[in-house]
Amino acid sequence: MAAAALGFGFQAMRAPAVPADTIVAGFQKTTVASVADAMDQVVGRRGFMSHDMRPRTAGPGVPAKFAGRAVTALMRQATPEQASPTLSAKHSVEMIDNSKPGEVGVLSIENGLDVAGLGGLMGTAARARGMAGVIIDGGVRDVGEVRALGLAVFARSVVPSSSVGRYATVDRNVPVQCAGVEVRPGDIIVAGEDGVVAVPSDRAQEVLKRANEIDQRESKMVPLIQQLKALGKAVQQFNRI
């Protein structure tokens, strides 16, 4: 149920202070594209989610880019016994209610593009907990309310439908597939206008180092390209495109 349907107003909320995490802080300063390239080069596999994983609550007061450690929940088509609101969202509610400030919720809904995994009420809770953002392999609804809260949500679709009676969560804090990428609890999620990248926690330091190197290389290329009014020599000199 949308919060507005109950007659309550809503407003942007101030998130609690986030404990220091030097790895996360480093990824907050890198570009999403450089993190994607660093995953290719360091880990040797794709880290970026599918092209339709887009920011759905972008606007004033909503972070355009964020990074944080993943907490996860998995949702599948419901059985008749799972049709109640309590059971339908049990694990995603627990994911939010047990989250720490700065963490990123990752909700995987199997074949769930026409199902909203988060709306105004869950968004209110996520923002109150100080979550950095939420990533949904599926849909989101109540986008105006969630935007007004200041919560960044990336999802593959925007739909008005409830998950109740259709889908139910089956587990949380387990590895999930999210828009073509495996995400494990504690992995680093980096999200921005270019999309979303998941970085394995055990390779995060290496990936961050390479992403910083890529950013630094490109920052040197830009003035050279402007000076030469050409691209080829800069690409040859820096081996980067």
What residues fall within each predicted segment?
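Ligand/cofactor pocket segment of small-molecule handling proteins
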Residues: 128, 132-160
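Acidic, glycine-rich flexible loop/linker segments
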Residues: 156-234
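Extracellular/luminal Protease-associated
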Residues: 95-137
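General beta-strand structural signal in soluble alpha/beta enzymes
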Residues: 48-51, 75, 106-108, 116, ...
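N-terminal export leaders
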Residues: 1-5
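Short coil/turn connectors at secondary-structure junctions
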Residues: 67-68, 100-103, 129-132, 148-151, ...
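Intrinsically disordered, low-complexity regions enriched in acidic/Ser/Thr/Pro/Gln residues
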Residues: 6-87, 92, 97, 217, ...
